[in-house]
């Protein structure tokens, strides 16, 4: 695989359909998409992000989510998910460069990124699908992992068939349409994991969906 420097230039990615691993789902895994220098630049930048642990309302009670997060995006790309309305913060330097890299390499035209930081294996994300109405229909969602390896588990809504996809630092997972219509996904707890993991999930939203 050709890897290039910190400038996030295009390169010839080793890409394969996850179906080659027996996973019959519209996902594409690119192992080692980011090199060590690129990962380090992003991790250093994450330390400056205004990460929060918001509360969501579930079954009549408020619960803090089991991770910290921040939403960055273009002007007019505010986001409502899990009952939380968040205003888009301005793009950080290296997250913005990564967005441009995804556009050059795969034609992904994201205008926002949700950053989730998992402090260790105690932090997690429950079953869900990224099907909010402000996400542009049939658009791809790109997910980049940095730090500790974690399992990404997908579950078919109709058959309940599950597949586990281990994601390692620097890996890129692209979820193609109709992934969000037919599948759910989660990041389960892994108590033996002691190191942090950061995930960047790039999405394309309908601009000004929630007004000016």
Where are these regions (language model features)?
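Non-heme Fe(II) oxygenase metal-center motifs and adjacent flexible, charged/small-residue loops
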Residues: 1-212
């Amino acid at each position: 695989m050709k890897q290039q420097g910190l400038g996030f230039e295009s390169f010839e990615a080793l890409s394969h359909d996850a179906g080659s691993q027996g996973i019959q789902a519209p996902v594409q895994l690119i192992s080692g998409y980011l090199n060590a220098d690129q990962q380090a630049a992003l991790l250093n930048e994450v330390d400056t992000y205004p990460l929060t642990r918001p509360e969501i309302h579930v079954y009549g009670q408020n619960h803090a989510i089991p991770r910290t997060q921040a939403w960055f995006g273009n002007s007019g790309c505010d986001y409502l998910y899990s009952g939380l309305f968040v205003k888009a913060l301005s793009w950080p330097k290296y997250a913005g460069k990564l967005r441009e890299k995804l556009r050059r390499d795969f034609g992904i035209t994201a205008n926002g990124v949700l950053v989730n930081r998992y402090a260790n294996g105690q932090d997690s994300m429950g079953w869900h699908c990224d099907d909010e109405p402000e996400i542009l229909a049939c658009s791809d969602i790109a997910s980049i992992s940095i730090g500790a390896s974690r399992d990404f588990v997908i579950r078919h809504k109709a058959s309940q068939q599950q597949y586990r996809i281990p994601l390692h630092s620097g890996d890129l997972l692209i979820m193609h349409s109709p992934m969000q219509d037919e599948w759910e996904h989660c990041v389960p707890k892994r108590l033996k994991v002691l190191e942090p993991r950061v995930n960047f999930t790039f999405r394309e939203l309908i601009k000004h969906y929630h007004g000016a």
